[in-house]
Amino acid sequence: MSWLEKIFNTSNIVSSRKASIPEGVWTKCTSCEQVLYSAELERNLEVCPKCDHHMRMKARKRLETFLDAEGRVEIGAELEPKDVLKFKDSKRYKDRISAAQKSSDETDALVVMKGTLLELPVVACAFEFSFMGGSMGSVVGARFVKAVDAAIENNCPLVCFSASGGARMQEALMSLMQMAKTSAALARLSRKGLPFFSVLTDPTMGGVSASLAMLGDINIGEPKALIGFAGRRVIEQTVREDLPEGFQRSEFLLEHGAIDMIVDRREMRQRIGGLMAKMTNQESPLVVPVDGSH
């Protein structure tokens, strides 16, 4: 073997390992496409620090960051979905439920908790969009009614964060009945004089937007949230007209009086806490006075 062959002999070369980066360390913003450090994004409540784009947030994480840390109690966790109709499309509904539970780490698309917000008692619930598109089935309806019952029992406000594609197709008429069921429950809450704060996040569509999501005493949108009943293309085909740009975004809805305000997720605790204190005539040392100009 010549001296040159000895130098380039592969057995003498020690390969340097590529530094392995664990999965999930970095995230790309879906709006500005900046690469973000996941831990920083989580600290910022899933709001892009570069462009303020509000990304979708897990229901449980949303409630844990919204409510005070002490005294949170989950409600309705014992209720689980059942395939009463033995429904099957391209896949059995039973299999869809199992897959959704595994991927989302939730048993259904609504998580309910009671606790306090800035030391004021409250019941809060949030839709889990990763569970079958946050669709509303029998369990979602039943858990929402339990949330209303808990608010009445504790004489406190109810807050709901909606993120849903609408009624759950696989439960047919039973899912449509949840629109009436949740609306009737909110009527009971209203008769008791207890406020309901509805926070519409991206996306809030279909049967959820046509029922509980739009029945708030105060309807709050997150910035640039998609809110509506049917999709843009379906509406354009029906009315045979071109629709204005962004007509289903929260900014357009605020401009036309369909919602009451738009609140940045990072300010949600203070804004809702301040409104709760005013509407229930309570005081909390943690509430910053709400500016009436907004």
UniProtKB/Swiss-Prot annotation:
Its cofactor is Zn(2+). Pfam families: Carboxyl_trans, Zn_ribbon_ACC. One of its GO terms (molecular function) is carboxyl- or carbamoyltransferase activity. Pathway: Lipid metabolism; malonyl-CoA biosynthesis; malonyl-CoA from acetyl-CoA: step 1/1. It comes from the Bacteria. Zn(2+) binds at C29, C32, C48, C51. A zinc finger (C4-type) spans 29-51. PANTHER family: ACETYL-COENZYME A CARBOXYLASE CARBOXYL TRANSFERASE SUBUNIT BETA, CHLOROPLASTIC (PTHR42995:SF5). This is Acetyl-coenzyme A carboxylase carboxyl transferase subunit beta. The lineage of its organism: Bacteria, Pseudomonadati, Pseudomonadota, Gammaproteobacteria, Vibrionales.
